[in-house]
Amino acid sequence: MCFVGIIRFHVHILRIIPGGERFFLLLVLSANAFGAGLDRYSQLVVSDSGANPRNGVRVTYLGTNSYQFEFKNHALLVDPYFSRVDLLSVALGAHIQPNSSRIADSMRHVAPTVDAILVTHGHFDHLLDVPIVMSKTHARLIASRTSIDLAKRAGASSGDAVIAGDVRRIGPWKIRVLAASHDRLFGKVPFDQTASQHSGPPQHAADWVCGEPLAFLIEINGQHIYIDSGGTAAPLPPPVHVDLAIMGMALPDSRARLTAALERLKPRYFLPSHQDDFFLPLSEGFQFGPLTDFPRVQSDCAQENHGRLILLDYFRPWTLPAHQAPNPKIQRPGKRSNSDGK
């Protein structure tokens, strides 16, 4: 087939594919090279060593925008997603379902009992696996009304629907629910509905609609962790100082708001999230997604000088250092103290 014929074929396919899946087919056509891994940025990757104390808040990256936070014998999950549905299945609107084998492999890194699962929005890469993870960990689900509805139709037994401004106290965790937004992909938020058009179980990627995007401010052990999955400059995070800011950086909208978001949060540590190619199995290791731009993120962070930029690799826990205020009796004049530790 000649080049013109290939273009005509692609245009024909785009015309007959429903609008939601069309976003992802465009992504397939635009992703002409695999992203690099973390080797190039090894100096930014943090993890616990055998000698490090683990009595603080431990953070484990589980891929996509999935995280586990642990403190003593308590655990909290955010957006657990391990099935990693392939891109072509999503682009062509094929039936998708949780991958039991991949979920089982990843659950080896998850605490056996989890206090709660927080979900930022209803897309499949945040919510698809949640009903199974709930059943395995006996966790309580905290999410938007739309996400709760989707999860229940997919098999979840219950859920706590929340809106911005709500506060939940679960064990040692204090969770504040914040307003958020979702990035646009090719000018539009994918699957941008607040209620599904179907009443049965979600079958296709387009059935997992966005709903009401949320962010969370988690208070634990005297430390504050902010987490979202990305978004636009409206709304920005609240003007609060946090110890760790985890912000989605998958798409241009998120990167455009980064400077303003860091200025408001003033984090000690900044962890860009949702940067990996979540259509690849976790077993293939971290690869940057085709639409990410980590060099820009790194450059913007250097210019703003708000907190230490870090990266996490899959399943390698890192303990958030305690904030150590400088001791005026010990600090020498003219010397700057380091309050962050390693």
List the predicted regions and their residue ranges:
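Bacterial N-terminal signal peptides
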Residues: G20-N32
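Beta-strand-turn-beta hairpins that frame and shape the catalytic cleft
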Residues: N52-V57, F71-L76, V167-R176, E219-I225
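Active-site neighborhood of phospho(di)ester-bond hydrolases with catalytic His/Asp-centered motifs
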Residues: V78-D79, V114-G122, I142-S144, Y226-G230, ...
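Pre-active-site segment of Zn-dependent metallo-hydrolases
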Residues: V45-G50, N73-V119, H123, P131-I132, ...
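Active-site HxH/HxHxD metal-binding segment of metal-dependent hydrolases
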Residues: L87, D105-R168, W173-K188
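Active-site-proximal loop/helix segments of hydrolase catalytic cores
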Residues: H198-R264
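Short, basic, low-complexity termini and linkers enriched in Ser/Thr/Gly/Pro
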Residues: R8, I13-P18, A325-K342
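Binuclear metal-ion centers of metallo-dependent hydrolases, dominated by the metallo-beta-lactamase
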Residues: R140, K152-V167, E263, R268-I330
